């Protein structure tokens, strides 16, 4: 087969796929004139608690969302004892300097469709589905009838102005407070299904699609209420599995506000809320046949067939994922601008956010985070490439909403958070894929960054080294590599009063002292952090360099 014919066939296939994708979207959404109305409802993490509109400018992908979106209609009732009401339709914008997920949702959806959109929002912190949102016997703040009245009055105003509309989707984020009532917790799944059923009845929309936001496991409650949170998630998943018009929206990979003291928090805060909204937007767009994922294929094969390849496994939590390192900041960092470009000489495979985003096989190394973010893999790969000869492949497995006990072979009672089997399967798959392409693979090591949240809570901090040791030992057994090197990097642990008595650094150092293939990397000279736990762009770059240099010193 000639090269010209292969190129022609590839072009025809590409055009066919593009046409088919466009056709599917048109078939599902033939009307670009009708106003599409979305309902947002829930408790504090739907309100946007502990966020600040003035902070949006800090996060490059979301700059400008503090300004009104004049083409998006907004009707709301937000708060508790004294609700903050729009009293009709207004332009979409932050309410009382608070950032809700509707801001980024609206911009993302508006960028992808021609139809006008509108948002109706009712949210109130500290409320329960079992009481406040109960459609049959509402109590407390009686939010079900209040929200129904808000929706009906908002739609009546559209009718009065003869604006054609359709209710397009219902975004729901709630459940934290139900876990503290045994009856509400046990019945959350049944209550949620009843909630969906009653909305479809009362809004006369039998095919209304619901998007159910996950309770974020990165929060304080994700740690000290693991079992309670698991029970609520199980209820959510029961509904989204049994109801074909309900979709579970993962959020545990989203940013979490940095609290005082040790840094842990209950709320997403500004960045997390903006990412939260993108999650809903992407899910809705998939529903109507629009996939915003950008393909990142190799232009040419990164290394010759049959050539040896060193495989580096990167693993960890918030900073290995790159929660607050933005590609948009690279142009400001002299000497690092090129990291924003794909490196066609290094193969990269990833499974990040606990499977929220997975690469399409092997791609060129480059920024591939969730929201214009990246991790230490970029500078790690660049440093290795400049200092060591040979072919390089990097496979990254992370979940920023996990803790170190989620990575142990034993796992925890929150079974949907047990990562060890997936982690080992990911490593084996990475090796197998490279070997299937004719490469001779050497597993150079596992490069793991210690869980940031684990060092910020006493019970976790005390067990961190023990959990890590269990994971290291079992990985060597399951990969049949008794001498497998683990490079364990650690940033300075939080120094809140009461935590200092648990010397997590010494505990990890003791593991290294007893194991010649366990290298403890004390990354204590990184650029100063803006807040506890999370490292920003410049620090993530330095972390990658520090890890790479440690490998070069110990290879």
Question: For each predicted feature, which ranges?
Answer:
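Sec/Tat signal peptide C-region and signal peptidase I cleavage site
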Residues: 21-25
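Intrinsically disordered, low-complexity regions enriched in Ser/Pro/Gly/Gln/His and often acidic
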Residues: 2-4, 17, 31, 355
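Bacterial N-terminal signal peptides that target proteins for export
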Residues: 1-12
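Cell-envelope and extracellular/periplasmic
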Residues: 26-555
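Bacterial N-terminal signal peptides
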Residues: 10-20
């Amino acid at each position: 087969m000639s090269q010209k014919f292969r190129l022609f066939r590839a072009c025809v296939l590409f055009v066919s796929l593009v046409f088919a994708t466009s056709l599917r979207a048109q078939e599902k959404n033939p009307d670009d004139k009708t106003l599409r109305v979305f309902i947002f409802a829930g408790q504090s993490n739907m309100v946007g608690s502990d966020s600040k509109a003035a902070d949006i400018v800090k996060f490059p992908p979301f700059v400008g969302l503090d300004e009104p979106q004049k083409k998006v209609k907004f009707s709301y009732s937000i708060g508790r004892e004294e609700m903050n009401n729009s009293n009709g339709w207004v332009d979409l914008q932050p309410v009382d300097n608070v950032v809700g997920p509707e801001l980024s949702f609206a911009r993302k959806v508006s960028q992808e469709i021609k139809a006008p959109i509108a948002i109706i929002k009712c949210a109130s912190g500290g409320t329960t589905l079992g009481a406040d949102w109960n459609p049959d016997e509402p109590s407390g703040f009686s939010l079900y009838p209040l929200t129904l009245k808000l929706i009906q009055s908002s739609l009546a105003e559209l009718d009065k102005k003869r604006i054609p509309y359709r209710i397009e989707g219902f975004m729901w984020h709630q459940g934290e407070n139900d876990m503290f009532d045994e009856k509400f917790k046990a019945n959350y799944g049944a209550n949620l299904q009843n909630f969906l059923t009653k909305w479809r009845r009362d809004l006369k929309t039998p095919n209304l699609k619901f998007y159910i936001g996950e309770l974020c496991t990165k929060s304080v409650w994700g740690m000290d209420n693991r079992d309670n949170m698991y029970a609520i998630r199980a209820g959510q998943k029961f509904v989204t599995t049994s109801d074909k018009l309900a979709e579970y929206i993962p959020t545990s990979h989203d940013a979490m506000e940095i609290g005082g003291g040790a840094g842990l928090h209950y709320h997403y805060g500004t960045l997390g809320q903006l990412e939260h909204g993108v999650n809903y937007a992407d899910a809705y767009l998939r529903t109507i046949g629009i996939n915003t994922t950008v393909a990142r294929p190799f232009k040419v094969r990164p290394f010759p067939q049959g050539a040896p390849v060193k495989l580096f496994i990167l693993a960890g939590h918030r900073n290995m994922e790159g929660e607050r390192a933005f590609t948009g900041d690279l142009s400001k960092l002299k000497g690092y601008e090129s990291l924003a470009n794909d490196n066609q000489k290094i193969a990269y495979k990833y499974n990040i956010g606990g499977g929220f985003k997975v690469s399409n096989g092997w791609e060129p190394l480059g920024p591939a985070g969730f929201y214009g973010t990246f991790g230490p893999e970029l500078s790690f790969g660049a440093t290795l490439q400049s200092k060591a000869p040979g072919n390089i492949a990097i496979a990254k497995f992370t979940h920023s909403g996990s803790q170190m006990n989620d990575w142990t072979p034993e796992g925890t009672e929150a079974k949907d958070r047990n990562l060890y089997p997936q982690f080992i399967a990911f490593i084996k798959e990475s090796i197998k894929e490279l070997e299937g392409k004719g490469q001779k693979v050497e597993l150079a090591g596992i490069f793991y960054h210690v869980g940031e949240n684990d060092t910020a809570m006493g019970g976790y901090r005390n067990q961190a080294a023990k959990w890590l040791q269990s994971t290291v030992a079992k990985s060597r057994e399951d990969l049949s590599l008794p001498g497998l090197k683990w490079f364990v990097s650690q940033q300075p642990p939080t120094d809140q009063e009461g935590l200092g008595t648990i010397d997590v650094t010494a505990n990890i150092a003791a593991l290294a002292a007893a194991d010649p293939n366990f290298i403890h990397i004390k990354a204590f000279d990184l650029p100063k952090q803006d807040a506890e736990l999370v490292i920003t762009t410049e620090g993530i770059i330095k972390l990658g360099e520090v890890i790479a240099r440690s490998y070069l010193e110990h290879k």
